[in-house]
A protein has these predicted regions:
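Aromatic-rich peripheral "rim/lid" segments of glycoside hydrolase catalytic domains that contact
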Residues: 363-369, 379, 390, 394-397, ...
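Order/disorder boundary and secretion-linked terminal/linker segments
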Residues: 427, 431-554, 558, 585-610
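Aromatic-lined carbohydrate-recognition surfaces of secreted/lumenal glycan-active proteins
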Residues: 171-176, 230-288, 346-353, 401-404
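Active-site-adjacent substrate/metal-binding segments within catalytic domains
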Residues: 34-116
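Glycoside hydrolase catalytic-domain groove-lining segments
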Residues: 279-366
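Active-site groove signature of glycoside hydrolases
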Residues: 158-226, 250-260
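Aromatic-lined substrate-binding rim segments of carbohydrate-active enzymes
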Residues: 83-144, 151, 241-246
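Conserved small/polar residues in nucleotide/adenosyl-binding loops
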Residues: 654-655
Length: 656
């Protein structure tokens, strides 16, 4: 055993020495930097690019790229080099000139990125994010102390080195060693540091460090009126610009992530909405105007904002709703962007904008229906065009669509407690708004979905039949996104009669009867198809997740009121054991709930249409299709209370 330990120790020491040697080889050039042209700069409120020896305006027409891919989580680097190469070609074909990533990507991402630009005349430039770990944001330690700052600065250094092809990274999450050898710095437009900052974190940091002295750096300084977060930003940005300039002889544009929750504007929201405001009277604002660049900076700084038309409340009820655009429409989104541009002396980039093509909505845009969900793919595309027009007419220097690809691992605020965190990447939750912002969708199944409700039976086989009675057949199948049903042989489907499919999903729940219907076993859900009156998914009260998701899982300052309202909603149902009602989910916000506005969305209302992408009348959100005596319907797993269909896990309520 002693010899084994000795041998293991020698092996570890040898590996460490090899890594040190490689790192020394990568960084031996530090004292002999080579000067590089700075090809991007800011000029007042414009970004400019150096082309053929002269500076010309550069409008960012970009798209964000995430790290999600079906079956893998982001830290697994599960997207191949070949996939990235294909994606860059598609992004170039749609006339985008910029991409943005949020943190260091895999080495093969940068390899494919370099190869694309080396072989294409029209380049795609990169806005590189520098990750800010959430554990730092919510730790009790002060972010401005040297220990915490050093963690952020080391991640920054690692990111810069990776872009210049001079980095070796050991990923503690996966155990992988990543070698970055492709220098893509010629194709880097700039950096966006950090994340959407939690407003309570910003407020806490400012109050905790009240009275701190401004920072005076070689490249960036903070003004006298800067708060603690802005002072930290000046230190962070100064470190990055100084390190890259002194080490690699180049400068890139610089920005810091921001969003409406921490913007520097004064947003007057309708007084009634303040009842549940957790951030009222806070100091939660970040203003880049309180950062000052020195003469050493040849590149410049831009303001970065992630702005969506449906959030926050100030865009739905505040002063911005009074603005009428040149098309004669109320347009609070454009007005808000105009105020951002007016406020800043530097270019403003909308680094995230978009709407998801999810089946159901959460936050709603009451003015132009640019809502967070409830859009099919066609409506999503139209919404993106409208938002980009707003970005241009507001005077922004560009915008970046959120996002390139759908991401199955994502969770949404109104669904996060209803799915298994460890299994989200293995299936597609059609109810999750966060999973469907992508321009690129991932079909479940092997290359295509198991079935598209389109009124055709070519996708069905004898093996799918589960019940047969005379000339009537019921067939079923499933994939990573839906469970599918097909009824064939009922000649009176369009005569106003209903088809009822009873489903027993949950143990110790359900009922054996309801109005006009009896069941051999307790059932939890009813799929009710009616060509004239509309179709719906009904849920028994024992299996209802809607109120549960608000009352039990919503952490808010006014949680007592939520419990009370939940009880009022649930009691009438619990006293009637045969009650079925349309399946619902939380919608809007806690504000809506406390103000007696509609807190729930009837997601069980089924939409008729053709879900086949090859159809001329394709509707990506169609739930069912009737064609002659054929009825096809698909139901998302989550609407049947599946917690993780990949592991056959369901949510149980009101059980011991």
């Amino acid at each position: 055993m002693k010899n084994m330990k000795k041998g293991f120790t020698i092996s570890v020491m040898t590996a460490v020495l090899c890594i040190i040697c490689i790192c020394l080889i990568f960084h031996c050039f530090d004292g002999n930097k080579s000067e590089k042209d700075n090809i991007f700069r800011t000029n007042q409120k414009k970004i400019e690019i150096l082309q053929d020896g002269s500076w010309t305006d550069y409008e960012i027409k970009g798209v964000n790229i995430g790290t999600g891919y079906p079956g893998v989580f982001p830290n697994e680097f599960g997207i191949s080099e070949e996939t990235y190469a294909r994606w860059f070609n598609l992004i170039g074909e749609m006339n985008a000139n910029t991409i943005r990533v949020y943190k260091i990507q895999s080495p093969w991402f940068y390899k494919a990125f370099a190869q694309y630009n080396e072989t294409h005349e029209n380049k795609i430039y990169l806005v590189q994010g520098v990750d800010f770990r959430e554990d730092l944001m919510f730790s009790e330690e002060n972010l401005l102390n040297p220990k915490q700052k050093n963690k952020v600065f080391q991640e920054t250094k690692k990111t810069v080195d990776a872009l210049h092809g001079k980095n070796i990274t050991f990923d503690t999450d996966t155990g992988n060693m990543c070698y970055y050898s492709n220098d893509v710095s010629d194709y880097v437009l700039g950096y966006v540091l950090g994340v959407e900052w939690d407003e309570m974190f910003v407020d806490y940091l400012c109050r905790f460090n009240e009275g701190i002295a401004p920072y005076q750096g070689a490249y960036i300084s903070s003004r006298q009126e800067a708060n603690a977060v802005e002072i930290f930003f000046s230190q962070w940005g100064d470190y990055l610009l100084k390190y890259e300039d002194e080490t690699y002889g180049t400068q890139k544009l610089l920005s810091f992530a921001n969003w409406p929750e921490t913007d520097p504007l004064v947003n007057e929201v309708s007084p009634k909405l303040s009842v549940a405001s957790a951030t009222e009277n806070t100091e939660a604002f970040i203003d880049l105007e309180n950062l000052q660049l020195s003469d050493k900076v040849e590149s410049g700084m831009f303001a970065s904002y992630n702005v969506y038309p449906y959030f926050p409340a100030s865009l739905q009820y505040g002063k911005y709703t009074e603005y009428i655009d040149d098309e004669g429409n109320r347009n609070p989104y454009r007005k808000y962007l105009m105020e951002l541009v007016d406020h800043h002396s530097c270019p403003v980039i909308i680094t995230e904008y978009g709407v998801p093509a999810s089946r159901s909505p959460a936050y709603k845009d009451v003015w132009r229906n640019l809502s967070q969900g409830g859009n099919n793919e066609t409506e999503q595309g139209i919404a993106l065009l409208e938002m980009y027009e707003d970005i241009q007419k507001a005077g922004c220097a560009g915008g970046m669509v959120f996002t390139w690809q759908d991401e199955w691992f994502k969770r949404s605020w109104n669904e996060k407690s209803l799915s298994n965190p460890d299994g989200r990447a293995s299936w597609s939750n059609a109810q999750s708004i966060e999973q469907f912002y992508g321009l690129l969708a991932f079909e479940p199944g092997d290359g295509k979905a198991e079935n598209y409700p389109d009124g055709k039976i070519s996708e069905w086989s004898k093996e799918d039949v589960v019940l047969e009675n005379n000339d009537t057949k019921l067939s079923m199948k499933s994939d990573e996104k839906y469970i599918y049903f097909m009824v064939q042989g009922l000649s009176d489907i369009k005569s106003g009669n209903s088809i009822n499919l009873a489903l027993d999903v949950l143990p110790n729940a359900g009922t054996t009867y309801t109005k006009n219907l009896d069941f051999a076993i307790p059932v939890d859900f009813l799929i009710q198809i009616n060509a004239e009156k509309g179709s719906k998914l009904l849920v028994h009260d024992d299996s209802d997740l809607a109120v549960y998701s608000i009352a039990i899982k919503n952490k808010s300052a006014a949680v007592t009121d939520i419990y009370k309202k939940a009880e009022e909603l649930m009691l009438p149902l619990k006293n009637n054991t045969d009650t079925f009602h349309v399946a619902s989910r939380a919608s809007g916000s806690v504000n809506n709930f406390l103000l007696n506005e509609k807190p729930l969305e009837n997601v069980g209302m089924l939409k008729h249409g053709n879900a086949n992408p090859n159809s001329e009348n394709y509707d990506s959100n169609a739930d069912y299709c009737i064609n002659g005596d054929i009825v096809e319907v698909r139901i998302p797993w989550s609407l049947l209370n599946f917690y993780d269909p990949s592991k056959c896990m369901v949510c149980l309520l009101y059980t011991s």
